[in-house]
Amino acid sequence: MTQFTKLEASSRAKAGKGAARATRRDGQVPAVIYGAKQEPTLVALDPRLVVREMQRGGWRSRVYDVTVDGASSPALMREIQLHPVSDKPIHVDFQRLAAGERVHVEVRIVFTGEDKSPGIKRGGVLNIVRHTVEVSADPANIPESFTVDLSQLDIHDNVRWDDLQGTGSVTPTLQIPNFVIATVAAPSADETPEPAAAPAAAPAKK
């Protein structure tokens, strides 16, 4: 069952760049909630809440219970626009969720057991092909993350979709059967010891 994260927001009446700038001058982040065949809802957020979610990670697959003037809407945070210089959030897009309507969402992958992997202990290199996977999911069962155990991987072993934990309620959108998530590659040639140099030849006798 999806865990909802509560977010308090305030309504704002006007759309447009000028209204958004005014919201920022008031110390808030302008945002919009769209989808579920309803009119978009214009809201403003405390920037500290947005930064908190960014720092937590996994916000793209987290379901939020956005409360505006006492009414709440389940929604996904689809995009956070950042200022090009300060990297502060300047706008947020939410997608309102409708019960029973599946959505596409990026779910992050958490890697564990790297320090116990026989292949990595022998000098192998972990190559992560995908840090996230896009899946189709019911809003009531969106996983916040998938987990994969690397502790048994040797050199040339790999991790695939079927090896991930927590995928039972979702379907990957990538149309490749059991695609690769990560591999343990052999050490590169640059890391192998160089052969000892041959001794210099003795000078010829005159």
Swiss-Prot record:
One of its GO terms (molecular function) is structural constituent of ribosome. GO terms for biological process: translation. Keywords: Ribonucleoprotein, Ribosomal protein, RNA-binding, rRNA-binding. It holds the Pfam family Ribosomal_TL5_C. Residues 10-21 have a biased composition (Low complexity). SUPFAM superfamilies: Ribosomal protein L25-like (SSF50715). Transmembrane segments: none annotated. It comes from the Bacteria. Residues 1-23 are annotated as: Disordered. GO terms for cellular component: cytosolic large ribosomal subunit. Belongs to the bacterial ribosomal protein bL25 family. CTC subfamily. NCBIfam families: bL25_bact_ctc (TIGR00731), PRK05618.1-2 (NF004128). This is one of the proteins that binds to the 5S RNA in the ribosome where it forms part of the central protuberance. Part of the 50S ribosomal subunit; part of the 5S rRNA/L5/L18/L25 subcomplex. Contacts the 5S rRNA. Binds to the 5S rRNA independently of L5 and L18. This is Large ribosomal subunit protein bL25. It comes from Gluconacetobacter diazotrophicus (strain ATCC 49037 / DSM 5601 / CCUG 37298 / CIP 103539 / LMG 7603 / PAl5). The lineage of its organism: Bacteria, Pseudomonadati, Pseudomonadota, Alphaproteobacteria, Acetobacterales.
